[in-house]
Amino acid sequence: MRETGTQISHNPSSNAKLGNGIARLPEMLNAGLNVGLGHDAAECNNSRDLFQVMKFASLMHRASRVDASLQQAPDVVRMATRNGSDALGHNTGRIETGRKADVILVDTKNQMFTPLMPENSDHLFSHLVFAANGSCVDTTIINGKIVMENRQLTTVDEQKVLEEANKAFRRVLERMVVPASANT
């Protein structure tokens, strides 16, 4: 697979929910394959929280192999950022000159980061993977543009988007579901 340039999207939460088994992630990584993280979609996972996916990606493999050395927090963060970007051919995933500025700012004053030893990067990575969730993100920057600041969206009316999404979903359901009167 490495010779063909195959890119892997590891979706541990949706695979578990759907009963699809556990990917051979340690073997893929040891073989030098590029593995990113994903969540599939809401209908396969019920969550789009990549922090939960990071946690599950680490814990699933540690528990199933009875080996706490697997999928260390910095490696899992790399899978969620750099590896995913590389797999998709995006110019993101790391902070470097010439790359798009896609960045999240995480509120380390959030209770999920307590206690915090900021001088210890392994401790910070551990909090990101095992304690944080999407609600810890304070600011989101996409291609250098702030799209969320202080947990408030800056480019769209969030309530309106949610209402429109729910209306669209109801329209899809109405087309899919056979009315009870059709069975009589």
Regions found by a protein language model. Name each.
Residues I8, D40, G144:
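Residue-level signal for inorganic ion chemistry
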Residues S9-H10, L105:
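Conserved beta-strand positions in the central sheet of alpha/beta enzyme cores
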